[in-house]
Amino acid sequence: MDPAHHIKDTSAELLSQQDFSILQSRLLEFLASQEARETVTASKELTLLRQGIRQLKEKVSKMEPEEMTVKEKKSIIEILKARIALKKAFLKMALSESNDTVVKKEDVRESPVDTFMENAT
């Protein structure tokens, strides 16, 4: 095969620290707007975050493992670990908020299905 045949501009396909920095800042913006209960802003940030993740996944899927540098592989692992940690923290926060909001049975209206099921037993 002709070696010149394999030469291509891969700068757009290579992972860069900027790719990860952008995702991290978008994630932080989303979490901040979520915490502040700014629904519209959180929705926009989540959309941008999803787009960024999709673009990063496309870049990674097009790369051969041997094309990735050790630094890129470590960066991907760190991002995945951070995502897992953030998901755990978010779920823990949501769980603690749901435990703080205790609903009394008399405050909840029974649905017709619940009434039917109680009467059937």
UniProtKB/Swiss-Prot annotation:
GO terms for biological process: positive regulation of transcription initiation by RNA polymerase II. One of its GO terms (molecular function) is transcription coactivator activity. Residues 102-112 have a biased composition (Basic and acidic residues). GO terms for cellular component: mediator complex; nucleus. This is Uncharacterized protein C24C9.04. It comes from Schizosaccharomyces pombe (strain 972 / ATCC 24843) (Fission yeast). Residues 101-121 are annotated as: Disordered. The lineage of its organism: Eukaryota, Fungi, Dikarya, Ascomycota, Taphrinomycotina.
